[in-house]
Amino acid sequence: MSTIIVKTPVTVGLQELFREHKLSKKSVVLFDSNTRKLFGDVVLEALRAEGFQLVELVIPAREASKSFSVAYRLYGQMIEADVDRSWNLLAVGGGVVGDLGGFIAASYFRGIPVIQMPTTLLAMTDSAIGGKVAINHPLGKNLIGFFHLPELVLIDPATLASLPRREIYAGLAEVVKYGFIADANFFDMLEAHFSEVATLQEPYLTEAVKTSALIKQDVVTRDFRELDGLRATLNFGHTFAHGLEKLADYRHLRHGEAVTMGLVCALYLSHRLGFLDAPSLERGLRLLQQFVFPKNVVERYFLASNSALLLESMFSDKKKLDKKLRFVLLKELGQAFLFEESVEDSEVLAAIESAKECFRQWQQK
């Protein structure tokens, strides 16, 4: 599996680290326009100082960059620069850079090594770990891709200081998810210190990032290709979230914002189906109540949505099987499972309506 390094600064000693992992000192370094401006000089200078041969690539900082057209352009630049299978690709950025970089690495010369250097909380704790890499199709998100594990995941929590608050909260959705699905003690820590993590205070931030990354790594190690349902538990709340993202045209909602809404729906569904008790439901909701959204985002893209249309949009999600939706539910805080039985539409719709009412009450406080 991947080696995960969490430290500040993470760019020190890369030559030795690459040597230990049998990686060449020939790297294609992929940025988006934002991460190039924020971190490009530091990363490139650190690599050059240690004798790396580099090819630099930059993509627009937007979800639309996860496309065949952008990938083809980058393939061309790599071919023109004589990049062969002895090279590796270092992806410096958030989920878009990591997904596109991993997709290109998985497919170029039938696969070259990829190193992920995530710079957003969402990427550090989720998308950069586990080897799922993909691009989008007009009919759905992340539908075309590979399993291609990174050799290294290089995480520097200090880079999060560059993020706007909206991106921090978007990433926190995945962090909180790990407490829900896999680690009750981690949930307790987040319950006690959510404000410190949200404001990037140490040691709580690094603890949250490292614990999240290691939980994801552990789950992926035990069920790499989602064969026994364990890895599917990472998708707690995501079936709802992907439906919300589709309704918002994959543009108006951050993934983590949709996940936060989806977590509330999934908590209610777990309770309605008789698995999660009322006290645990309330604890979960109290934690999620602390999330902050931009003005009107919840109203416009969740409360004003048609619940039946949301349910219909959920059927484009990758977690459907044999045209049936599969839901990850909680037995208790810290223990999730993949519910293999069909869930009546009426139960799903009732969970959505309960979640909407919950958000309405939060907005009034």
From Swiss-Prot:
It comes from the Bacteria. GO terms for cellular component: cytoplasm. Keywords: Amino-acid biosynthesis, Aromatic amino acid biosynthesis, Cobalt, Cytoplasm, Lyase, Metal-binding, NAD, Nucleotide-binding, Zinc. Its EC number is 4.2.3.4. Zn(2+) binds at E174, H238, H255. Binds 1 divalent metal cation per subunit. Can use either Co(2+) or Zn(2+). Its cofactor is Co(2+); Zn(2+); NAD(+). Pathway: Metabolic intermediate biosynthesis; chorismate biosynthesis; chorismate from D-erythrose 4-phosphate and phosphoenolpyruvate: step 2/7. It holds the Pfam family DHQ_synthase. One of its GO terms (biological process) is amino acid biosynthetic process. HAMAP family: DHQ_synthase (MF_00110). PANTHER family: 3-DEHYDROQUINATE SYNTHASE, 3-DEHYDROQUINATE SYNTHASE, CHLOROPLASTIC. Belongs to the sugar phosphate cyclases superfamily. Dehydroquinate synthase family. This is 3-dehydroquinate synthase. It comes from Chlorobium chlorochromatii (strain CaD3).
